[in-house]
Amino acid sequence: MRVKGIRKNYQHLWRGGTLLLGMLMICSAVEKLWVTVYYGVPVWKEATTTLFCASDAKAYDTEVHNVWATHACVPTDPNPQEIVLENVTENFNMWKNNMVEQMHEDIISLWDQSLKPCVKLTPLCVTLHCTNLKNATNTKSSNWKEMDRGEIKNCSFKVTTSIRNKMQKEYALFYKLDVVPIDNDNTSYKLINCNTSVITQACPKVSFEPIPIHYCAPAGFAILKCNDKKFNGSGPCTNVSTVQCTHGIRPVVSTQLLLNGSLAEEGVVIRSENFTDNAKTIIVQLKESVEINCTRPNNNTRKSITIGPGRAFYATGDIIGDIRQAHCNISGEKWNNTLKQIVTKLQAQFGNKTIVFKQSSGGDPEIVMHSFNCGGEFFYCNSTQLFNSTWNNTIGPNNTNGTITLPCRIKQIINRWQEVGKAMYAPPIRGQIRCSSNITGLLLTRDGGKEISNTTEIFRPGGGDMRDNWRSELYKYKVVKIEPLGVAPTKAKRRVVQREKRAVTLGAMFLGFLGAAGSTMGARSLTLTVQARQLLSGIVQQQNNLLRAIEAQQHLLQLTVWGIKQLQARVLAVERYLKDQQLLGIWGCSGKLICTTAVPWNASWSNKSLDQIWNNMTWMEWEREIDNYTNLIYTLIEESQNQQEKNEQELLELDKWASLWNWFDISKWLWYIKIFIMIVGGLVGLRIVFTVLSIVNRVRQGYSPLSFQTRFPAPRGPDRPEGIEEEGGERDRDRSSPLVHGLLALIWDDLRSLCLFSYHRLRDLILIAARIVELLGRRGWEALKYWGNLLQYWIQELKNSAVSLFDAIAIAVAEGTDRIIEVAQRIGRAFLHIPRRIRQGFERALL
């Protein structure tokens, strides 16, 4: 019987398979991006950190202890590097600059520490009996007018001597500003701050001469500098550079006028946090300085008064010659030219209004007058002549020639930084005093209120908050924290490769650490090697300078703020470097500048293409792009590295086969020799086994072999039985193999025999296994069919039983229901028949 097959059409399956294969190929062709770690990228973030100071060692007299304690600063760099950041725009804000606050706190702390070991003048808080000091002669001085009557008081008082229970009467000269009368008789006085402050006398060798201080950032941080010549103090700056230290800033403590500061490069610049708010101070930076020469013509002497055991009070003993008033001289022409430039800027800011300069509206002497330190004495000069003019369209007063002379008064008891409860007594300076300074800026305030005219703006000198003084110098700086670790997507994925030494050969051009900040991420100018090396070398160099300064001045560290800051900067720099290295170690990137990872790049972090990222964006722009996801990426890299370390044991086994060239390594030759000896020994053993088996076989057949190479006739087939010579007949040719000679031939013959033997046995084994598998498969299939039929049978039986059960239940329920209905009907009929039965009963009764 012939079975006719049915031909099926599989064309649609071929088409579907081809389409599916094409889709898979297209999907597999899409490039997958992976996270790559870069170390040494020019990225920074705004930060606040502890700055330390640097100062020129030759800038101060070693015999005098200046109040700024610059002897504890590190030496300035003879070749400071300033690296311009091209194509970089950075926001600056001089009004919210932590450097200003830090400098203010540092200067206050330096004054406090400088005055700690000095004498407290509490014993001088006694009644002073004073009279006005008169000139020694009646002649008039031609240099400058005499001091006002009563400006200097000759006071006598009682103090404790070196023996505590013994009092002694002393006398000294005090300025009128330093004493206040007790009674109305104008003969009893007391020191001005005795009721409110603890007066500390400055130590005899303390100098208040301002010395340039360079503020420096620790390693791992940098100071950005704005070089825009017309920068107004806040907003974006397009000309940015990076420095390690600021320029030398003189901590000049003055009000109204800024002295010995930096000048503007292109015209006068006015800066304010909010020009519309009259409560905000206006800081004016001049283009050309105006020289101010101050003099105290009095030839004073200084005397020492013992006020207790081991304590001395230094006071003015006498004035040699006439008593003349201190004063300052300013060129009237230069000052009016300066005001003219300032008026031009003010009118541009506030509209073409009339600008009026007036004297201070009142307050403490430090604010009402121009206060500053001159040669160790604190001058308070009346600045009314400087601020007493009206300007209409840059047209001011005509009497601009000549010299402007400012009368000055001197105070020895001054409030420190306008702090409550702290006052200082400056010991008098011997001889005459002369000092020359440069006015480089002004502090102005603008009048406000309803009474102010719409056509006039009134400006008055201000000051008092020393933060504005430091702000006038630090306006162009900001501190940033360098973030050398960067992540970006690339096509490279981390793979387990052989461990080998690798040489980093990136560009050798020195651009500085942040020199490539304005370049694109893929630019060749991104020299990661130089930048990474500078991180560590900068730390090492900085620590060497710090340690050198600390070692030289260790006996003074306990008296200065700078020593503590240097130690903080040292620890902070090392911590910053170790933190980055710890992250690299956790990620498996130690010692690498470019480190691939096995973390896939998520498009939700940034869906920009590689070309947009690497050719059009800087590292700073890229960092702002992914800033919200940086911590997540770091976590994923760490988890990926942990997973890789778990698999390291298995991968090490495969690592030996990573390259065939390792097979020829001389360290493996002994292993190869060992394997060769084992193979030869195995072959010899097999030869012996086969020889013994052949001998046993021959002996069983009745032969006596003469040698190991003696061959025996091969057995005939079953269709050709063997015979003997006596039986006659033609002998068949025996199947035999030729004898072999030589070791190699013998080895080859044995190997061939072994291979044939192994092949035949393996083939037989495979055939047997296939037969067994086939048999097991057939039996298994039959068993499955049997169990399937059995299962089907029992399912049918269960189904039938269930149907029968349901039928029986239904029948029983139906029968029970019929019985119940019948009983109910009978009961109903009984009730219905009750009246009939009653009627029948009555009928029977009547009958």
Swiss-Prot record:
Glycans are attached at residues 87, 135, 154, 186, 195, 232, 239, 260, 274, 293, 299, 329, 336, 352, 382, 388, 392, 398, 401, 438, 454, 602, 607, 616, 628. Residues 1-31 form the signal peptide. The chain crosses the membrane at residues 676-696. Pfam families: GP120, GP41. A lipid is attached at C755 (S-palmitoyl cysteine). Residues 503-523 are annotated as: Fusion peptide. Residues 710-736 are annotated as: Disordered. Residues 653-674 are annotated as: MPER. Residues 360-370 are annotated as: CD4-binding loop. Residues 697-847 are cytoplasmic. Residues 32-675 are extracellular. One of its GO terms (biological process) is clathrin-dependent endocytosis of virus by host cell. Keywords: AIDS, Apoptosis, Clathrin-mediated endocytosis of virus by host, Cleavage on pair of basic residues, Coiled coil, Disulfide bond, Fusion of virus membrane with host endosomal membrane, Fusion of virus membrane with host membrane, Glycoprotein, Host cell membrane, Host endosome, Host membrane, Host-virus interaction, Lipoprotein, Membrane, Palmitate, Signal, Transmembrane, Transmembrane helix, Viral attachment to host cell, Viral envelope protein, Viral immunoevasion, Viral penetration into host cytoplasm, Virion, Virus endocytosis by host, Virus entry into host cell. GO terms for molecular function: structural molecule activity. The keyword Transmembrane applies. Residues 624-658 form a coiled coil. The record marks R502, A503 as: Cleavage. A motif (Di-leucine internalization motif) lies at residues 846-847. A motif (YXXL motif) lies at residues 703-706. CDD domains: HIV-1-like_HR1-HR2. The keyword Glycoprotein applies. Inhibitors targeting HIV-1 viral envelope proteins are used as antiretroviral drugs. Attachment of virions to the cell surface via non-specific interactions and CD4 binding can be blocked by inhibitors that include cyanovirin-N, cyclotriazadisulfonamide analogs, PRO 2000, TNX 355 and PRO 542. In addition, BMS 806 can block CD4-induced conformational changes. Env interactions with the coreceptor molecules can be targeted by CCR5 antagonists including SCH-D, maraviroc (UK 427857) and aplaviroc (GW 873140), and the CXCR4 antagonist AMD 070. Belongs to the HIV-1 env protein family. Some of the most genetically diverse regions of the viral genome are present in Env. They are called variable regions 1 through 5 (V1 through V5). Coreceptor usage of gp120 is determined mainly by the primary structure of the third variable region (V3) in the outer domain of gp120. The sequence of V3 determines which coreceptor, CCR5 and/or CXCR4 (corresponding to R5/macrophage, X4/T cell and R5X4/T cell and macrophage tropism), is used to trigger the fusion potential of the Env complex, and hence which cells the virus can infect. Binding to CCR5 involves a region adjacent in addition to V3. The membrane proximal external region (MPER) present in gp41 is a tryptophan-rich region recognized by the antibodies 2F5, Z13, and 4E10. MPER seems to play a role in fusion. This is Envelope glycoprotein gp160. The gene is env.
